[in-house]
């Protein structure tokens, strides 16, 4: 919204609109799906200050910058535990949802400890939304563009990580305008030295426990060695998963 408002201010400053006209429009109540911004743009079109094609370009640019903004409105549990896993399975149907029923023949001891299964590879999916922690307001109002997240040194937070219970992690980073993907084996996670205790309970919160549950805070630069393009997710999981299984 910041970029759109700056563009509208630029258009207004170069238009013939008076301050009184602008103030009158801004004072009027706006209800969804209308907004003060759309009202001003419509007014500018009515005056011939901008063409419909220029309006359409503003709309296209706004949608491109905010194509994943709706994910910031999701409840934490829905986003963190449901959306990421379902999104990956939509991209690659080869991934099997890990349930007792689905794995009865190939992994009969399954007890909910990982999310997806791929030809013997156990996979855990985690997602994190990039947002400013220095301002107040809703999560959506603080959502970062990719460039903003990188420039701010945003640390992606992945929690409830159980490297002893899976072979490969798929981590999704959500920005307003793009999704980022990092694929790493559980061995690679341990080698980062970033895995810290989450202190969830006495059974999984200590490092010497067989099922240690931890969390990481890592910047995009720190995650760079594990970055993959969306179309390469399946191949990366195969490569890292099979390498670990075959050890």
Language model: regions and residue ranges:
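Nucleic-acid endonuclease domains
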Residues: 1-114, 127-247
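Active-site beta-strand termini and strand-to-loop segments that position acidic
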Residues: 116-120
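Short hydrophobic-acidic sequence motifs that mark active-site Asp/Glu residues
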Residues: 122-124
């Amino acid at each position: 919204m910041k970029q759109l408002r700056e563009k509208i201010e630029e258009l207004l400053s170069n238009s013939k609109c008076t301050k009184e006209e602008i103030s009158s429009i801004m004072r009027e109540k706006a209800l969804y799906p209308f907004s003060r911004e759309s009202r001003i743009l419509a007014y500018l079109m009515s005056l011939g200050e901008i063409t419909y094609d220029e309006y359409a370009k503003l709309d296209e640019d706004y949608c491109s910058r905010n194509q994943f903004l709706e994910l910031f409105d999701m409840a934490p549990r829905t986003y963190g535990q449901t959306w990421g896993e379902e999104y990956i399975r939509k991209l690659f149907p080869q991934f099997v949802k890990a349930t007792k029923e689905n794995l009865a023949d190939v992994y009969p001891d399954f007890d909910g400890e990982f999310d997806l299964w791929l030809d013997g590879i156990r996979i855990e999916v985690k997602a994190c939304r990039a947002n400013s922690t220095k301002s107040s307001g809703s999560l959506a109002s603080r959502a970062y563009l990719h460039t903003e997240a990188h420039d701010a040194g945003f640390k992606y937070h992945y929690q409830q990580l159980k490297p002893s219970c899976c072979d490969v992690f798929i981590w999704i980073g959500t920005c307003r305008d793009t999704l980022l993907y990092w694929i790493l084996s559980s061995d690679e996670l341990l080698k980062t030295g970033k895995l810290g205790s989450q202190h969830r309970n006495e059974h999984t919160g200590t490092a010497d426990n067989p099922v240690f549950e931890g969390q990481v805070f890592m910047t995009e630069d720190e995650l760079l060695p594990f970055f993959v393009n969306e179309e390469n997710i399946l191949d990366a999981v195969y490569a890292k998963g099979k390498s670990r299984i075959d050890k």
